Amino acid sequence: MTTIFERIIEGAVECDKVFEDENFIVIKDKFPQAPVHLLIIPKKHIEKLQDIQGDDFLLLAEAGKIIQLMARNFGIENGYRVVVNNGLEGGQSVFHLHIHLLGGGLLGSIA
């Protein structure tokens, strides 16, 4: 099944893209939960975090570098939240792995 993120990656759906490289696309969330709310999306289809295997773990390291870059570019490097919703019970609504980067204000505690 094709997800909205795959359609965005293919260019079939418009988005507010802020970064793209060989392995990732970063877009502004359509329904932001913070002043800065970005989605870091691997181009390779991986349904959820629990499904990562083998060399795909390297994508997590690359995502970490992109998160740092985006935090600097958006002026939130002094405080931000990184979230991955994993599976239906974890609140995942689009079943293509993606990482939320939220910041730009005082974020309330969630734990």
Curated annotation (Swiss-Prot):
Protein name in UniProt: Uncharacterized HIT-like protein CT_385
Q: Which GO terms describe its cellular component?
A: cytoplasm
Organism of origin is Chlamydia trachomatis serovar D (strain ATCC VR-885 / DSM 19411 / UW-3/Cx)
- SUPFAM superfamilies reported in the protein's UniProt record: HIT-like (SSF54197)
Q: Where is the HIT domain?
A: 4-111
Q: Where is this motif: Histidine triad motif?
A: 96-100
Please give one Gene Ontology molecular function term for this protein.
hydrolase activity
